[in-house]
Structure formats: C-alpha cells, structure tokens
Regions:
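Active-site-proximal, substrate-binding regions of enzyme catalytic domains
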Residues: 32, 36-79
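Active-site neighborhoods of divalent-metal-dependent phosphate/nucleic-acid chemistry enzymes
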Residues: 67-113
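Acidic, PIN/NYN-like endoribonuclease modules and their adjacent C-terminal/linker elements
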Residues: 34, 97-131
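Residue-level signal for well-ordered alpha-helical positions
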Residues: 17-18, 40, 120-121
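Extended beta-strand/beta-hairpin segments
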Residues: 2-6, 91, 122
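Alpha-helix boundary recognition
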Residues: 23, 60-64, 84, 101, ...
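Phosphate- and divalent-cation-binding pockets in alpha/beta enzyme and binding domains
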Residues: 13-14, 36, 78, 116-117
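Short, well-structured N-terminal submotif of metal-dependent ribonuclease cores
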Residues: 1-33, 44, 49-56
C-alpha cells in the first residue's frame, strides 16, 4: 500500500472530477486541509466560478474521501523547522511536506513551483498516481 500526502488542490480536483482513488493507496493530509478546501470552494462561489450547490456537493464528496487527517505536535514542530529551512514565512505548505517526511511515500500537489522547491526533500508524485 502506497501512502500519499495530498494537498487541497489535489483533493479539490479529485472532487470536481469525481475520481475514485485506487484502494491500493492510503491518503494523508494535515488537518488544515478541511479549512483550505472549505475556503477555496467558498471563494469560487463568491467569484461566480461555480454555483453554491456544486460547491456543497464537492464538500460532501471531500468529506467522504478516505483521507486520514493528522496534526500532532511532532508534525507541527517539523513543519516549523521546514519552513525555517526553506525560507517560507507560512507553515501551510510545510505541514504537507513534514507529513510526507514523517508518514508517507510521496507528496501529491498540482503546484509545480511548490514541487520544484521541495526537490530532494521529499518525493513527489502526479495526481495520476492516485488512480
């Protein structure tokens, strides 16, 4: 079983495309995933990109995804260290990277710039690896 850390962009795409993740994989994410996906969908509604009922349907699909959410003190401490190491003011992305280091085989993100910035720190995989 391959363990993947998935970020909010990946989860939102999986929900919008109604993709079923292979049962051969285990998905992990920091607890902040809930707030990030909620906010991203609300913002999309406010910008007129999607209807509110579509956003709520995607939130329901996200809530049913078998993603193990983690946010313990060890993760937070490692995220802080990584943010310092990488020169990031925010620890949001560092939480995903830290979780990958601590518990997963690879990190899946749609953010090409983020993926480049963590080369050599954690392995990354494409969203297609989840199918």
């Amino acid at each position: 079983m391959t363990k993947f850390v998935v970020d909010a962009g990946v989860v939102l795409q999986l929900a919008s495309e109604e993709v079923e993740v292979s049962g051969a994989h285990k998905l992990l994410a920091p607890t902040l995933l809930r707030s990030q996906t909620l906010s991203a969908l609300h913002e999309a509604v406010q910008r007129g990109e999607i209807e509110a009922d579509v956003a709520r349907d995607r939130l329901t699909r996200i809530g049913k995804m078998p993603i193990r959410l983690l946010g313990d003190a060890v993760l937070r401490r490692r995220a802080w260290e990584l943010a310092d190491q990488l020169g990031w003011a925010s620890t949001y992305n560092a939480e995903y990277v830290a979780l990958t280091q601590l518990q997963a085989d690879a990190f899946v993100t749609l953010d090409a710039e983020l993926a480049r910035s963590i080369e050599g720190i954690v392995p990354t995989a494409s969203i297609d690896a989840l199918r």
